[in-house]
């Protein structure tokens, strides 16, 4: 039976045409330590235009680029480790680089408390970036979990979980 299954997989893989394929790019942590925040500071704002310049081509060429947003967008004061809060301009640079989906359930998702988590989701929604992992309330979780995206005729389901939140309490319902 194993041999038949393997033959099926080989046949199926070889019979796919270009329109039957999708390229998915997964990247690790998108985060901002204090030195990165300080380096991006320009006048009254932050400039991340060059942040992804060496990898933007690869990110934007993928049919779907997915990254782990390992910071909150909790507003000022902006800080790096241990309680991350990145400037909004960082999220704009992530979108401009070509990321389609950000995963938000990780050990830093509550670094700025519930308000920081909610603001992060609000910012993602305002830029129309798909996201999975954290939710403002049980209703939002029920509506958006699991994240289902249709792309190039494919249905992709993304699940995102975390092992913990660095000792910060979570609302188990959301």
Predicted feature locations:
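Acidic, metal/ion-coordinating pockets
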Residues: 18-174
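Sec-dependent N-terminal signal peptides
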Residues: 4-14
């Amino acid at each position: 039976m194993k041999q038949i299954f393997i033959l099926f997989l080989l046949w199926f893989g070889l019979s796919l045409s270009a329109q039957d394929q999708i390229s998915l790019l997964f990247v690790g942590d998108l985060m901002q330590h204090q030195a990165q925040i300080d380096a991006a500071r320009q006048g009254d704002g932050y400039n991340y235009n060059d942040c992804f310049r060496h990898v933007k081509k690869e990110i934007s060429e993928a049919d779907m680029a997915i990254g782990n947003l390992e910071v909150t967008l909790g507003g000022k004061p902006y800080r790096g480790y241990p309680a991350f809060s990145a400037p909004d301009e960082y999220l704009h640079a992530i979108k401009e680089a070509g990321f389609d989906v950000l995963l938000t359930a990780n050990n830093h998702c509550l670094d700025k408390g519930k308000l920081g988590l909610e603001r992060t989701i609000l910012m993602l929604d305002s830029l129309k970036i798909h996201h999975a992992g954290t939710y403002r309330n049980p209703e939002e979780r029920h509506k958006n979990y699991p994240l289902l995206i249709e792309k190039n005729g494919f249905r992709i389901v993304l699940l995102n979980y975390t092992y913990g939140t660095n000792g910060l309490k979570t609302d188990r319902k959301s």
